[in-house]
Regions:
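Conserved hydrophobic/aromatic packing and binding residues within compact polymer-binding modules
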Residues: 6, 20, 31-34
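DNA major-groove recognition helix of helix-turn-helix/homeodomain DNA-binding modules
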Residues: 45-60
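A short, Lys/Arg-rich alpha-helix, primarily the initiator
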Residues: 1-16
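Recognition helix of helix-turn-helix/homeodomain-like DNA-binding domains
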Residues: 26-41
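Short, charged recognition helix plus adjacent turn
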Residues: 8, 33, 62-71
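The alpha-helix within a helix-turn-helix
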Residues: 10, 21, 51
Length: 71
């Protein structure tokens, strides 16, 4: 499983979904899907824009959790 930490990053800065969408140029639905961890796939350009906006690395935004650790 891949966990997205977008909600944490946004919470630390008290940002709303629309704020991130406006600043990054990403569609609101894309940001919302990542925020709610419902995204099934994410384009590299979206990851790049989010990393630039939050000044973070991909590993700060996403975390791989092996299936055995979920139990």
């Amino acid at each position: 499983m891949v966990k997205c930490h977008l909600s944490t990053l946004m919470g630390m800065r008290k940002l709303k979904i629309i704020d991130v969408a406006t600043e990054t140029g990403l569609h609101r639905n894309t940001v919302a899907a990542l925020y709610n961890e419902r995204a099934e796939r994410v384009e590299a350009v979206a990851i790049e824009k989010l990393c630039q906006f939050f000044e973070c690395k991909v590993g700060d935004l996403f975390e791989y959790i092996p299936e055995t650790e979920q139990d």
